[in-house]
């Protein structure tokens, strides 16, 4: 997972809770395209209601090849931490489990639940991008993302000068 502008890397033990992040491999000027990526899991942004939303997620997931699914399951899952403490967003787990009970999938419920959790953790308004999901969040970001309709991909651009070895952050 390397490009000329950034490297996805694991942080050292001093900030281990961050996991992976994107580090600039050279100076990046404001306005520079850092990443253009088509989502591995593309969703219809016009779905209404939980069932349509979840159906759309599983349709996209089931269209992935096995390599893409493996990479998808390597993404962060906010719920791993939550399951240890058993503190969920109010009712979210119940919504997931009710949907899965009413709409069983041809794979174990645990896999289906993990799909929903990973989308919730890494999704942007119309899907999940494997590389872009490795960019960390900051309220003081140095890059921004948007949907590029001309190429049907998500673009990440520097919004300020990024020095070599700085982390690239998204809002």
Describe each model-derived feature in a short phrase.
Residues 1-171:
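Conserved catalytic SET/PR domain of SAM-dependent protein methyltransferases, capturing the structural core
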């Amino acid at each position: 997972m390397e490009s000329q502008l950034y490297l996805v890397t694991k942080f050292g033990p001093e900030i281990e809770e961050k996991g992976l992040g994107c580090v600039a491999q050279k100076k990046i000027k404001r306005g520079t395209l850092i990443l253009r990526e088509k989502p591995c899991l593309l969703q219809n942004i016009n779905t209404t209601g939980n069932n349509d939303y979840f159906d759309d997620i599983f349709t996209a997931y089931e269209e992935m090849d096995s390599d893409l699914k493996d990479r998808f399951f390597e993404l962060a899952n906010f719920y791993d931490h939550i399951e240890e403490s058993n503190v969920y967003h109010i009712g979210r787990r119940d919504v997931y489990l009710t949907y899965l009970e009413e709409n069983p999938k041809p794979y174990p419920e645990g896999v289906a639940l993990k799909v929903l959790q990973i989308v919730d953790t890494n999704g942007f308004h119309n899907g999940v991008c494997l590389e872009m999901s490795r960019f960390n969040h900051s309220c003081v970001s140095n890059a921004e993302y948007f949907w590029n309709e001309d190429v049907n991909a998500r673009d990440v651009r520097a919004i300020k000068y990024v020095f070599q070895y700085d982390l690239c952050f998204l809002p």
